[in-house]
Curated annotation (Swiss-Prot):
SMART domains assigned: Tubulin, Tubulin_C
A biological process term (GO) from this entry: microtubule nucleation
Function according to Swiss-Prot or TrEMBL: Tubulin is the major constituent of microtubules. The gamma chain is found at microtubule organizing centers (MTOC) such as the spindle poles or the centrosome, suggesting that it is involved in the minus-end nucleation of microtubule assembly.
Protein name: Tubulin gamma-1 chain
Top-level division of the source organism's lineage: Eukaryota
Keyword vocabulary terms for this entry: Cytoplasm, Cytoskeleton, GTP-binding, Microtubule, Nucleotide-binding
One of the record's GO molecular function terms: GTP binding
One of the Pfam families matching this protein, by short name: Tubulin
Cellular component, GO annotation: centrosome; cytoplasm; gamma-tubulin complex; microtubule
Broad class of where this protein is predominantly found: cytoplasm
Amino acid sequence: MPREIITCQVGQCGNQIGMEFWKQLCMEHGINPEGILEEYAQNGEDRKDVFFYQADDEHYVPRAVLIDLEPRVINGIQKSPYASLYNPENIFISKHGGGAGNNWGRGYCDAEKVQEEIIEMIDREADGSDSLEGFVLTHSIAGGTGSGFGSYLLERLNDHYPKKLIQTYSVFPNENDVVVQPYNCLLSMKRLILNADCVVVLDNTALTSIAVDRLKLLQPTFPQINSIVSTVMAASTTTLRYPGYMNNDLVGLIASLVPTPRCHFLMTGYTPLSLIDQKVTSVRKTTVLDVMRRLLQTKNIMATGAIKKGAYMSILNIIQGDVDPTQVHKSLQRIRERKLANFIPWGPASIQVALSKKSPYMESGHKVSGLMLANHTGIRSIFKVIYDQYRTFRKRDAYMNIFKQTKIFEDNLDEFDSSDEVVKSLIEDSAAAEKMDYINWGNDDDDMGYDPRAPPNFSSMQ
């Protein structure tokens, strides 16, 4: 039986994609912007209680905590048609309202100052759950609040709820979004590696390219990019909200995709893609084979250049629509025959498939749609760009004074050195995973602290 998940939205980007996610969920479950269930959705078979709970007046409230150090985005949410959807007690805006100034150190230290207030909100949500399974964090790793505050929150959640799963939807930036982003990204990466069980990488560069090339948007807006993200988030949770026999809880989804503890960074693909307010311009017949084949194409992968080299560790395709299971079997056979997916040599070379219902409350221009969640060694190319940019900055100590003004860096820069080691280790681990002798790799390295063959111990997370 599906269990509850609490969503934590941190920073400008985290709250923007969180807002789009809740809009999407409301539409898929027949809930109006005020949280009231529409007449036509009264007898649904969906599980709304995974992400929503019902207030005393029976309107649906997201199990969400909204956090930001500057008020603009959350104020916008509170003035939107969805203003009364959220629990006002679960909204935190810094009293100073100045933001974190794109400084990871400020975001991290500000989080430490208000941790009791935040944990109290989360505890209250957790206490209202019958059987809490875990947390979802939405944030960006480029700025100050999503990266710094988000990092501190990951550490605290890990300490405070050691047996609960933590999944993140983390936006990785375009190359020149923020001048100090190599520092912010590296420091955030350490926490994503050590304190999260699963990270869905949302590569802004790839998302923008997909919006231009596939949706034919000349200059994609933030809401349009965020709408693509919300489509991915909603599709990745569809088996939890419309449960079947398999993949109907978060632990099942993650365990099937994460073969070793550190290699828990996933890339995504989605097809056919369209925006809610966009007319479908190309009409084609969507079959299971067509969808599954397209999901493996580079142009549909939401991570820049990530699958040009390397190999898949695992693939889970969530296929939505009216699907005959025999078609799935035939499609998998065809993909195997054509060798469309290159897998690691030491693991099972198979694509897992989860079949899911489509929401009966939303019109779709396509009979079948699909989301791919994939663990691919090539994702390290994104991490290597961050790491190399960081090393270039660090050699010159560029902009380091900005960080030295914060408490965590006022005495030393050990946190940078520690993050450097952890990220470098992940990049090496990911490269080693492509070789047959990976199961013996790192045995002499005391810092690794785990057997690469051992799956994450999800069984204890009850």
